[in-house]
Amino acid sequence: MNTTVNILLGELIGTMVLIILGNGVCASVNYKNMFAKQVGANWLLIALGWGFAVFCGVVISIQVLKGNANLNPAVTVYFMINQKGANIGLLFAMIAMQLLGAMIAQIILNSLNWKHIIENDAEMLKASSCTGPSHRKAWFRNISYEMLGTMILLAGVMAGDYHKLTGVFFVMAIVMSLGSVTGCAINPARDFGPRVIYFLTAKAFNKKLQNPVSADFRYGLVPLLAPIAAGLIMGGFSLLINQ
């Protein structure tokens, strides 16, 4: 693509992202049934917490273990397309490790928080493990929110040469502005791994949990597949703009 097209496309898409995130956060704190509206200041804590969680995961993966710090199957799928299938075996193994890491982490958290878990409704355990939408039957909207959020996150990955930790601020912005409808997975491992652990915990400790609820794997397809679709789209987009 030539410089003029890049400049004009940059203004178009950059302004789109600006308004989506800017007015998105306004919608989140104003509309009834938006999670940010319902939980108030706690939503800011959640957004900051997830941003810092990404920061810590990236630093440990890159600086301590000398890894790649994808930490997200959608990111790995993006690189799979961007690199035209190079090292595809390694990339699939990375996705498996991401899912396994998420599951082990949730087991550790459940063990640490067990006394709190059994003195609260099981819905609290599920809500702190995996995502759920404000309107479950709004499939198109839920898929769209997860895809859009992941696509913006992957735009941050595409800007990785600017700074390796750009994604931290992208995550915070996405959760604040676009997370109030679906709970904002934007990472299949982050949702599916802990969802499986919630399901197994509810089965194994059914008599100890208060009012167990379904793991809802049917809805779980949304945070599993929508980010993967976003990875495919953004991988293709990266090839297009770098021709």
Swiss-Prot record:
Q: Which InterPro entries match?
A: Aquaporin-like, MIP, MIP/Aquaporin, MIP_CS
Q: Name one GO cellular component term.
A: plasma membrane
Q: Which reaction does it catalyse?
A: glycerol(in) = glycerol(out)
Q: What Gene3D superfamilies does the record point to?
A: Glycerol uptake facilitator protein (1.20.1080.10)
Pfam families, per the entry: MIP
* Lineage top rank: taxon: Bacteria
Q: Where is motif NPA 2 found?
A: 187-189
Which positions, given as ranges, span the membrane?
7-27, 44-64, 88-108, 143-163, 166-186, 221-241
The primary site where this protein sits is membrane
Q: Which GO terms describe its molecular function?
A: glycerol channel activity
According to its UniProt entry, the function of this protein is described as: Mediates glycerol diffusion across the cytoplasmic membrane via a pore-type mechanism.
Name the PANTHER family on file: AQUAPORIN OR AQUAGLYCEROPORIN RELATED (PTHR43829), AQUAPORIN-9 (PTHR43829:SF9)
- What is written about domains in the entry's comments? Aquaporins contain two tandem repeats each containing three membrane-spanning domains and a pore-forming loop with the signature motif Asn-Pro-Ala (NPA).
Q: Which family does it belong to?
A: Belongs to the MIP/aquaporin (TC 1.A.8) family.
Tell me the protein's name: Probable glycerol uptake facilitator protein
Originating gene: glpF
